[in-house]
Amino acid sequence: MKQILDFIPLIIFFALYKMYDIYTATGALIVASAVQIILTYFIYKKVEKMQVITFLMVAVFGGMTIFLHDDNFIKWKVTIVYALFAIGLTVSHIMGKSAIKGMLGKEITLPDSIWGKINWAWTLFFTLCAILNVYVAFNLPLDVWVNFKVFGLLIATFAFTLLTGVYIYKHLPKDQHLPKDKHQQRDQETQNDTQQELSGKNTEEK
């Protein structure tokens, strides 16, 4: 559900660009992003910082695009958002904290060295996306950039997320690789051993 909410503003932006122009599409993107934030809050009772940053950038640079009738602002918005993400991850690492670990560490147990590598990998990914957007936005036709923004970056992010998932799985502690029934079996065996020990102690006391 959350992924669908994240994708809807992009689809609306793409559809209205094809039907009308970049300025109509940008206005719709601002409204759709605001609605997305509201729905996310009411459904999940919280909004991620990345979503808030993205919305603020859409509102500011989208508004400037419409007010000044200059699509360069909405193009720069993409690069600035990715650059901010990269800077945020870099700062968190310098401060001795992995932002990625902060998001996933409650559900996944990994050594800090692995979290650090994942943090740097996403820093590099966001940096490359920021640079690539500049090239596509200012060297290729607007139609190409819109397709790149909506589909190219989305597919790249999805693929990199999958690669991150594979990397995390390879470094999970062995007990986290066990299926649920194996966990239950192990817990039952531990419980039985504990009961036997307690029974033995009770026998000795008697």
From Swiss-Prot:
Keywords: Cell inner membrane, Cell membrane, Membrane, Transmembrane, Transmembrane helix. It comes from the Bacteria. Residues 178-206 are annotated as: Disordered. InterPro entries: YciB. This is Inner membrane-spanning protein YciB. It comes from Vibrio atlanticus (strain LGP32) (Vibrio splendidus (strain Mel32)). The chain crosses the membrane at residues 22-42, 50-70, 76-96, 118-138, 148-168. It is found in: Cell inner membrane. Plays a role in cell envelope biogenesis, maintenance of cell envelope integrity and membrane homeostasis. It is a multi-pass membrane protein. NCBIfam families: ispZ, PRK00259.1-2, PRK00259.1-3. Residues 178-189 have a biased composition (Basic and acidic residues). One of its GO terms (cellular component) is plasma membrane. Belongs to the YciB family. Residues 191-206 have a biased composition (Polar residues).
